[in-house]
Amino acid sequence: MGFMNMKVLVVNCGSSSLKYQLIDMENDKVLCKGKCDVIGGSMDAITPPFIEYKGRSGKKIKEVLPLKDHLDAFKAVVRYMTDADEGVVSSLNEVGAIGHRIVNAGPFFKESTLVTDEVLKTFNEKSIPYAPLHNPPALLGINACLETMPGIPEVLVFDTSFHQTMPEKAYMYGLPYKYFEEYGVRRYGAHGMSHQFVTEEAARLMNKPIDELNMISCHLGNGSSITAIKNGKCVDTSMGFTPLEGLVMGTRSGDLDPAILEFVMDKEGIDIHQMLKILNKASGLLALSGETGDVRDLRELRKQGHKRAAMALDVLSYRIRKYIGAYMAVLGHVDCITFEGGIGEHNPDVVKACVDGLEEFGIIYDDSHIDDEMYEGIVSTPESKIKMFVIATNEEVIIAKEAMRLAK
């Protein structure tokens, strides 16, 4: 099989889900995509286990079926991929590599790596605590692929790799040094694949060599992060040891005074695990508005005069603007700012609010795009010294490219 004709399967496993895409690397075309969900659930439940698949015909197929574990789910994916009518490969030998998205493996893996027995042992024994919600299901997905598609190279691609170029002054916390030395406590960041994709895309749009590009990438979705990029490399990012640090998000608190934890735990009579669940699942825009963490719904509520929804959106745009200003100071010179992710790509009024008041710094939003919620491209005026782009991010392409690079 030729290198450029390689088809790469991209896999992203959650605790009860498995998302997948098969990409033809010759033209970055998605041959099939879908997900298995409610893995491990009962067939008698209101929402029983199911697979969604979109393949040869382009028609979305949904089948309810027993999926007791990730292995069952992966077998269902393989069955559809090789199906006589809707399949996209005649045999699994056409798949040249499998790329797995890994949120954070701690200090043990700094870049994408081929799966070997030693790699699996290290990941299983040492990396799980650095993303305790995400890493166990990722491991289940890796093992399911190994059993179902033996002999096909598997590659772990880390959401933290793009941020490994951060200097020490950006990733260190002001904590006892032994926490860093012995436990790997430092800032790792997240959304690295998205930030990497938009950096490459911004270099193309700016017609500038990537190693000469200074930019600020704003990945804004239910989880959000902002990254400062100097000469094409990450030098700082808003998320930290976990994705809890940084911006106010859909249900995550973002930056806060750590002393609040003890104060609230004492008042509420809760333990640290309950507190962390609140910070991750019951904070952010959801907590501020008292209604929802979804920006689309918050915008509708604001139109209806909902004061807390308006306040939540104000807090969101203020925090983003504050990080943009900080990263302008970090970079010195900025060529462009990008907005990506569900919020960044489909909420122009929110994007505009993030840069309102920055005109003195040469950042001017083009108001002609304010009503266009499907626009992709430049959103700054010709007079704006710093260009702004809305870019549809594609993390799967980065995973596939990394898998292809290491499997060739």
Where are these regions (language model features)?
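Glycine-rich beta-strand-to-loop/alpha-helix junction loops that act as flexible
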Residues: 13-14, 101-103, 220, 338-346
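Phosphate/pyrophosphate-binding loops at sites that engage ATP/ADP/AMP, CoA/4′-phosphopantetheine
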Residues: 80-96, 204-209, 324-335
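Glycine-rich phosphate-binding loop of actin/hexokinase-like ATP-binding domains
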Residues: 162-266
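Glycine-rich phosphate-binding/hydrolytic loop that grips phosphoryl groups
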Residues: 345, 366, 370-408
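Glycine-rich phosphate-binding loops at beta-strand->alpha-helix junctions
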Residues: 335-357
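Short beta-strand-loop/turn "lid" adjacent to the catalytic site in phosphate-handling enzymes
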Residues: 81, 85-134, 155, 161-170
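Adenine-nucleotide phosphate-binding core of ATP-dependent small-molecule kinases
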Residues: 277, 284-288, 295-330
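Short glycine-rich, Thr/Ser-proximal phosphate-binding strand/loop in the N-terminal lobe
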Residues: 17-68
